[in-house]
Amino acid sequence: MRNFDAGAPVIIGVGEASRKTVAGEWPAPRDFAAAAIKAALDDTGQPQAVAVAIDTIAAIRTFEDSGVSLGTGSPDNTPEAFGAAGGVTAKRLIYADVGGQSPQAMVNELAGDIKRGTCEMALVVGAEATGTAKRARKAGVTLDWRLASDTEFDNRLSSFPILSRTEIRHGIISMPLAYSLIENARRMALQLDGDAYAQQMAALWSAFSIKAETSNHAQFPGFRSPEALQSYDNGNY
């Protein structure tokens, strides 16, 4: 291939993990992280060589460490714990900041590091087990997902408040409320009325549901037509 940039960052493996748990099973986030990491390593075709070459692990901050605690506790060093569970160690450990932007932000940042030559190979991993925590709470089971560590890591937790006084004053105190404002701002920018915008969004999400129809990891498996997504029937919410 001509004009190939040998320093260009390339994603060489991806992995996903989920499971339907049964009574008596209480998998922690690091259990799911382990399965996802192993799947990603296998996806590279050279799992052992890649695992050894990884010098950076970036873990996406869990809900437990984002101010939405379910009382399970968490490892002192989540990137280290997730990596170790998947058989990977690294000299550089990053625990990403709060927010849904973190997965893509970490991919972007580490791609830049690879391009600049400050990172050879990186692993980005995130895992949650909120279903386990909720089942345990209902069953009266106490879970302890803490794991001691004194290893240093880059803790990206910001000190800025997630909500401003203006947002609180106007009742914008949850993400769904903020999202609805953003969607309406987008609708106005596109000069669409409510019905036209709903049709456009229903068509978009119907296309996503084609993937959900065949995915083993889909929370709501099955195809949903645009008409079904615009209705208020059959559990649509």
Q: Where are the regions a protein language model picked out?
A:
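A basic- and aromatic-enriched beta-loop-alpha substructure that forms the phosphate/nucleotide-
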Residues: 99
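Conserved phosphate-binding catalytic cores of ATP/NTP-utilizing and phosphoryl-transfer enzymes
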Residues: 104-112
